[in-house]
Amino acid sequence: MDEIINKYQAVEKLFKEIQQGLAAYDQYKTLISEMMHYNNHIKQEYFNFLMIISPYLIRAHSGETLRNKVNNEIKRLILVENINTKISKTLVSVNFLLQKKLSTDGVKTKNMWCTNNPMLQVKTAHNLFKQLCDTQSKTQWVQTLKYKECKYCHTDMVFNTTQFGLQCPNCGCIQELMGTIFDETHFYNHDGQKAKSGIFNPNRHYRFWIEHILGRNSEQELGTKQDPCGTKVLQQLKKIIKRDNKCIALLTVENIRKMLKEINRTDLNNCVSLILRKLTGVGPPQISESILLRGEYIFTEAIKIREKVCKKGRINRNYYPYYIYKIFDAILPPNDTTNRRILQYIHLQGNDTLANNDSEWESICMELPEIKWKPTDRTHCVHFF
């Protein structure tokens, strides 16, 4: 970013020197006018560049971690917006204009190093142009981005075609590759094969459930056409709470699910975390991005292993919140009481289903070194709240 700003400032200084040099000659009035056109053009580009990066510069003052993230995003924007190319094109046009006009006019000067010598300004323009448009310099600047290196654990990332980007094999961090086209021939129907309706993407399921477990989903999901904000549902739940003399501060996921069943709104079971936050004023813990990414990576690996070891005769349907519960129960330290509150917001199924899931999870953990198997204890998370 600083390099781009320095380029714009250097170009502005260059234009000023050229115009001052040419002002001593009457025959260069047309050239000065044309130079003014390019000067205004590059000033507009500089203004647009500042408008693009200004929101990121404000965020950069929020801390060292966010500052590094913002700097990487600004570097990506510079590449996407082709800022270097735009500057180079303008410089090429100006350089061509100067060479053409000055050579055809054939003005002779007595002293080559006179301060008002326009040829001296041309020489300065040539030197600056070579400096700014040097191909090797630009290549070295691009290489410093290291887009394949994970920003969390600094290991080489691998391509993930289902995510259309790069994924870290250690922490699971996913980096989208803008403007990249992947070979999708393996998605197409081949002769003798039945076409599938869609591509299974475990990451999509993980993000859906994490969004709902953490209560980050839209409040519009609670509403209907007649009640867009879900006010009626919340009023019905408050009446039940008052009727049963329930303590709002002690409401649980199971309490909300039972009340939703009573008012025939079990379609909102996925929104229990959001409802709890609306009723109690206390929401789920805000898990850090690094922990969520690690959980996503383990979740994806667990689903892949499950497809290989799943028992015959069982319905091929996963209850994804169970997997998320087991993953966060394993990766969150016992003394991390704040983040372990997430377990309170995950509904677990009946005892028989839970026992079958635990048996299947044990088989998955045998091939999943990140997780150590242990049976699910429904009361395990009670002392954290």
Swiss-Prot record:
PROSITE patterns, per this entry?
ZINC_FINGER_C2H2_1
Record's keyword terms, sorted? Late protein, Metal-binding, Zinc, Zinc-finger
Cysteine-cysteine disulfides: none
State the source organism's domain of life.
Viruses
Q: Does the keyword Transferase apply?
A: no
Molecular function in Gene Ontology: zinc ion binding
User: How is this protein induced?
Assistant: Expressed in the late phase of the viral replicative cycle.
Query: Pfam families in the record, alphabetically?
Result: A2L_zn_ribbon, Pox_VLTF3
Q: Where is the signal peptide?
A: none
GO term, biological process aspect, one: regulation of viral transcription
Q: Where are the zinc fingers (C2H2-type)?
A: 166-190
InterPro entries in the record: Poxvirus_VLTF3 (IPR007031), VLTF-3_Zn_ribbon (IPR014900)
Q: Which family does it belong to?
A: Belongs to the asfivirus B385R family.
This one is known as Zinc finger protein B385R
Species of origin reads African swine fever virus (isolate Warthog/Namibia/Wart80/1980) (ASFV)
